[in-house]
Amino acid sequence: DADDEPGSAQERLAALLARPCFALPAFSDQGGPFAGTRGRFVDADGHDAIPWRRATLAALYCALMTDLMLDLIKARGAVLVEGPFAQNGIYIAALAALRPASPVLPSHETNGTSLGAAMLVDPDAPVEMPAAVPPPALDLAPYRARWRTLAA
């Protein structure tokens, strides 16, 4: 659990960046952009590594995969996050840092899917949007670039 690691989301991510470890895809055999590859943990040089700060690394991995998928579909604009990811401060901070031009909106609604379906019927229906999370003062671009290189 991410709560077992001390510090704020930004402090946890900064500690991981100071001693980088990468979770490389894929940890599921259900398809996706890395179908046929097996998940593993490596250091910055691509050598096998024992992951540390596992909860932080797992949340960062999920944010990197989300960022990649949004890039693949050429998504622009706000990113609305709901469900358990919306409650994960590390995931939200990492996604906001990875996509500083796109507001990241963590929803705390329990009926987001129903609201989305209703908006398809009535796009003008008033919906209260959650507040955007400001990107943390972390530069994840070099980490993302290295992760994508190692994952390719």
Regions from the language model: what does each represent?
Residues 1-82, 87-148:
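Active-site core segments that coordinate phosphate-bearing ligands/cofactors
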Residues 152:
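Nucleotide/phosphate-binding catalytic cleft detector across ATP-hydrolyzing
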